[in-house]
From Swiss-Prot:
Disulfide bridge partners, by residue number: none
Quaternary structure annotation from Swiss-Prot or TrEMBL: Two subcomplexes smc5-smc6-nse2 and nse1-nse3-nse4 exist. These subcomplexes are then brought together via a number of interactions, forming the Smc5-Smc6 complex.
Compartments reported by the entry: Nucleus
Protein name per the record: Non-structural maintenance of chromosome element 4
Record Pfam families: Nse4_C
Lineage: Eukaryota, Fungi, Dikarya, Ascomycota, Taphrinomycotina
Amino acid sequence: MSSIDKRDLRKRYRNLINKVQESRLELVDEENNNLYETITTANDLFSSVDAPTEATLDALLLTKTVDLASIKARQLHIGRPKFNIELFTKNIKQFLNYPTSHSNVTRIQEIDTAWSRLGKLASNCEKQPASLNLMVGPLSFRKKERNIQRRERLQKAPNVLTQPTMLNERNITTQENNTTKNVLHISRLLQAHQPVNFLKFITNPQSYPQTVENLFYVSFLFKEGKAALVENESGILMLETRIPPTDDQVVAGEIRNIQLVLDMTMDLYENIIKEYNIKESIIPTRAPVETSTNSNTWYG
């Protein structure tokens, strides 16, 4: 096919596409056969298509005609006679036999009689009387009253209430003194056992909580520069004492702080005991701190 034929083919395709777009309402009409003629013309044109450009136009035309054919198919009433509104209106008028009287009163009465006769005829086509569903809304309406339930305040028996522990300045001072006391005690133990395996030093095989506390107290020695971790030839961290730096050394930047985080989990705690075969704790087990209250009565 020559280039001129291709241009002509594309032109005919575009004309068909424009015709389909402009005549959508006419093409879906039941009495109109132009849609069939359009599809037939498109089939004839498709026999000359041999390039992607023309094939694209054919696909676009096919899509539009298929959409219109689907709409037209839904409008078809196969096996049903076509309902003619004009003929139906004409028959209604003949049945009613509209009055020709010039008197308004007489004319209104005759119209009412005619419509009553039509209503009786229509009632013969109904199998059941009209139900309430055809009416708008219920016959009666009762406003629902809102049921508001008041919640009563929960009253607890006085004998089961306990007074919370009241912390005052004296209690806080005592806790601070205990922390300082334990840090000094651990510092003396370190001086007596240094250099010592760091994990062996802080681990208490009889108490996991006190192992965590020992790690907490040793961190104060690191912070004050009184202890340091040194790796030995076997790669084990050894804990030993240090002389705290002076203020001049800190200001001059001669001291470099390295912050480490040790997550002492229960699994790690048990593995340390098993790995180093720890039987006794270097740091003695401390007595538990008991908290007592002066009264079991709630005041509020």
